Structure formats: structure tokens, C-alpha cells
Amino acid sequence: DSIVDEEVSQRLEQVQMAEREIVLEEFREGLGLKGNTLAFLRSQYKDSYLVYQISSKYLFEPILDVPMADYSDGEFVTDEKTKLKSFEVDGKSVTSHVVDVSKYQGDIDWKAVKNYGIDGAMIRAGIRGYGSGEIVADTNFDTNMKNALAEGLKTGAYFFSEAITVEEAKEEAEFLLNAVKPYKVKLPLVLDLEMIDGDDGRNEKLSKEEMTKVALAFMKEIADAGYQAMLYGNIRTISEMVDLTQFEDYGLWFAYYSNEIYICLLYTSDAADEARS
């Protein structure tokens, strides 16, 4: 029996080594075809994990049980002149192209933005400083809002949050509501929630549960005022900062810069550069 057991063990070890070599070979071939490690890992775990990279570390977050879009690269058409992507159904675009702007874009020629093929604009109303914690208005908000509306663009607005309490989140929502009150805003009002690198971010000290509670307080204030509330963030926002399953009643705006569709809505920062003066 011991001889049989030894032979079985040897055979199992040989099979395991052979399978390991097959996996490694597939990995090497995949890296060669995809061109980079991150793209390959995403292709391998697309149905089970969100994969992202922080410095030299690859992180894997289980995909949550939330409603998902079923877009694929093949269903997007890219305009050769503007490079804007459109999602088509039966050969017709069902996409709205929207830019987001703040004072950092300077003086914007909104007529040029409109002519470029842009349908709307998300305009920054203000921020809470991640160091001071003070709310600061975006100095170009009113100018951008008035001029975008004058060109017939739909508009929405966003606020960069560093709230660490429910009370601060409500204060930010009230600030945003007051900012848009004079205007006919048809697009969502957005909580911009991002992780600040380093130790400067106020909200980095919060747990995911605490941050989720704070963000939801903002959302509720906006929704109760009759607007569509939306969360803005990148992969780290939805995987590390908040529990995404708690936001199914609200809009979600992903920041993801790549030519390859992954979980992408915001896909370029250059579309309307030529409209800046």
C-alpha cells in the first residue's frame, strides 16, 4: 500500500507541476498580448474582481452584487475628428457628451464647446479644503453656469467633499443647493469624493462605514430638494471609501482614464481643450 501511495503522490505532484507550467505559460502569453500587467489581470478577473494599481501594488476587490451596465468596447463608436465615444443602439447614438469644469480651466469659449459636440457641463460649485476644512466657492462657477446655459447646454454641478461628519455633509449639500438655485439645472448634483494621497486628507481617517454614512447624508439632502443626486469617484472611491451597495438609489459617475472600456464614464481630460482661451 505504501508503494501505491507513493506512486499516487508522485503522479499528483507531476500533474500539479504540469498545470503550474501551463498557467505560467498562459500568463506570459497574456502579458505579451495585452502589453501590460494591469490590462492582463483585468481581463482574467473581469467577472469576479475589480483590479487596480497603487504604486507597484495590484489590488483586487470583489465585484459587488449591484446593477451593472453590459457595455462592451465593440458597441462604442469613436468620432475620428473629436475622439468622443458614443454608445449606439440600432446604429443611433444614445450618448450625451458632458464635460466637467472648474476655475482651473480658465476662461472657456462655451460656443466652441457646443460646436465640438458637447451636450452638457458639470460645473464645480466649490470645495471643502482637505487641510483647513473650510468651504470655498469656485470663483468661476457663476460665469461658467451662465455662459454654458446661454449656449443651450444642459448643466449640473458638483462639490469636492472633505466632510467627516453628517453635519458637514449636510452643510456641503446646502452650499451646492444654494449655488444652483438661480439656474435651471437639469443634470445631477454631485458629491465629488476622492482619496487624497498622503496624510493630508481629512476623510481618510474615517472607516468605510463612517464615510458611507457621511456621503449618504449629502445624497439625501440633494434628493429631498428634488434634484438627482450622484456620487463621483474612481475605483478607490467605490472599493475603499464607501459601500457601493448603499448607493443604488443614486447616480454614479466613474472617473477612469483609458482607451479600453473597463468601468468607464469619464474617459478623457482633453476633449474640450481647444475651447479654452
Language model features by range: what are they?
Residues 185-265:
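Catalytic domains of cell-wall/extracellular-matrix polysaccharide-remodeling enzymes
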Residues 60-67, 84-89, 121, 154-157, ...:
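Generic detector of short, locally flexible boundary/turn motifs and exposed helical patches
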Residues 267-276:
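Single conserved hydrophobic/aromatic residue that forms the stacking wall/gate
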Residues 144, 218, 268:
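Aromatic/hydrophobic pocket-lining residues that form π-stacking "cages" and hydrophobic walls in ligand
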Residues 152, 180, 219, 275-276:
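Generic helix-packing signal
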Residues 95-115, 122-214:
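Substrate-binding cleft of extracellular glycoside hydrolase catalytic domains
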Residues 3-116, 124:
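Boundary/entry segment of secreted carbohydrate-active catalytic domains
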Residues 90-94, 114-117, 149-151, 182-185, ...:
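Extracellular/periplasmic catalytic domains that process cell-envelope and extracellular macromolecules
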